[in-house]
Amino acid sequence: MKFRIYPAIDIMDGKVVRLYKGKKDEVKVYGDPLKFAEKFSEYVDKIHIVDLDGAFSGKPQNLDIVEKIIRDVGVRVQIGGGFRDYESIKKAYDIGVENVIIGTKALDISFLERITSEFEGITVSLDSKGGKIFTKGWIEEESLLVEDAYKMLRKFVNRFVYTVIDRDGTLLGIEKIKRFWGDEEFIYAGGVATPTDIIQLAEIGFSGVIIGKALYEGTISLEEALEVAKSVGKKNYSSS
């Protein structure tokens, strides 16, 4: 499987921002989502978008911007942030989103069954702090370990985003992770800052990585990340 790099565009109040560990009161603004989408599209054909307003409110707030990115830039999109009802998910797919990422509502099994039977590409976000799942904009702790959530949800989806909340937006690098998943597509997010981080994640068995703050702060360039991804992809760690 090809190891993929997903540049991240987190949107709040119509602008690209990065939060520190997901805290909305620790925010840095970077600018226009469309401009960053255009820049990233020169190197990749798919980007990762988070509707932060949606994550905190419980309903997507920036799908108009996402639609414009898809239409005007022509890049493929996976998006998360506030997708907790059928109508929001349907609207995202209607405007051309390729993968809708759900976190909070993934634990509602009847809901998950319904949407995975109707829509292709549903992705589950396993948002972790201290080994436990957090939901509703990473605010509420669930009495469920990440590994147990995965075992419960793998029956319905084969694509996951694994986010380490305490590393997100920190540039601190990755934490030690022991692979607990099978052959599903597993994408890492949280603290990636260097080529070494990417190599280590590939060695663990991740199939891709989401990079946000490191790109905006220049600790790694998208070109450099893609070169590393190309080299680790040839070694095919994920199938070992």
Curated annotation (Swiss-Prot):
Gene Ontology BP, a term: L-histidine biosynthetic process
Keywords: Amino-acid biosynthesis, Cytoplasm, Histidine biosynthesis, Isomerase
One annotated Gene Ontology cellular component of this protein: cytoplasm
Active-site residues per Swiss-Prot or TrEMBL entry: 10 (proton acceptor), 127 (proton donor)
Group of enzyme by EC: isomerase
Reaction catalyzed: 1-(5-phospho-beta-D-ribosyl)-5-[(5-phospho-beta-D-ribosylamino)methylideneamino]imidazole-4-carboxamide = 5-[(5-phospho-1-deoxy-D-ribulos-1-ylimino)methylamino]-1-(5-phospho-beta-D-ribosyl)imidazole-4-carboxamide
UniProt record similarity statement: Belongs to the HisA/HisF family.
The name this protein goes by in its record: 1-(5-phosphoribosyl)-5-[(5-phosphoribosylamino)methylideneamino] imidazole-4-carboxamide isomerase
Organism name: Pyrococcus furiosus (strain ATCC 43587 / DSM 3638 / JCM 8422 / Vc1)
Lineage: Archaea, Methanobacteriati, Methanobacteriota, Thermococci, Thermococcales
